[in-house]
Amino acid sequence: MRVMRTLMLWLLPIILLCSFCSVAFWIFLSNNNVIPHPSSRIPQKSSETKSSKGCSKDNVLIAKALENYSHKWKKHEANFKRFRSLLSSKCHAVSKAVVTQNNTPLGSNVIYDGERRKPLQVTQALFNILAKEQPFGNATWESCAVVGNGGILANSSCGEEINSAQFVIRCNLPPLDNRYEKDVGNKTSLVTANPSILHEKYSGLMERRRPFVESLRPYGQALLLLPAFSYGHSTPVSLRAFYTLEDFGSDSPLPVFLNPEYLRRLLKFWRERGLNSVRPSTGLIMASLALEICSNVHLYGFWPFNKHPNDSRPITNHYYDDRESKKNVHSMPTEFEHLLKLHKQGVIRIHLGECQPT
């Protein structure tokens, strides 16, 4: 027993010394970045993998577009009529795209399409500013140009061709000044304005309002389509836009409100066809509207990728800036894939690259 006790007294200091040296050694390695940290590498690897997958899918879609463009486009009348009939039977744009006194009576409730909240009751004051009837009527325009804001329009020389359309739809108050007119034209029949733009550019119309009115001059007396009833916060600023034009806007665009019921129907229509985005983009909404009210639908500026299809040169997100869109809300490449399918079927025509002089 005495021998064992003596042995333990000798071993204990040695064990403690070895442990101390081991800890000190590992601390030294860590501080000098000799030991890699697995946790710091995992996200990077995941991010690279995700980015690689995204690029791969984009390349597939670009290849599809180029394949379709290798053949001369021709309208397929039977396909067009079939798709238009199906779209009209589900969404009813002619009677429901815009909130009117006919489809939204006094005392009825407006249900927001973008959020679950208490319905908005149509008061006398709100009813009075609603359009008395649908602005599209029962007429069908022979040709419509839906102009997206994609960077592919830069240096396209498509302005003259766009202006030749009978009805021209533009998205989110894009600039039409002399810098861009050659590429995007200046004719406008309908232009949309998201509430976010009214907040960002015009302080939500809580301060000076005349700059907003002046900025609308390039659109002439086009329809100004406001999504006033998508979200609760969209309503006040959209109503301020309406009253601003009523107070200051002689010879300015005519403000009307996008119908949330139409948007719900349209979202369901596209989801049934495999589009699972949170909500459709303005471009897809306007392309869908055009398919119901026009005999021939042409899309310009619809290209959701950062390289040109012809020569892979880098292009900006918009023809006027390189600001990122809300990709978490919209699924632009997937939407484009659906539109590309309609192009291939001869239902709509997507224009990529430069336009030929007329």
Describe each PLM feature range.
Residues 2-358:
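Metal-ion/cofactor- or nucleotide/acyl-coenzyme-handling active-site neighborhoods
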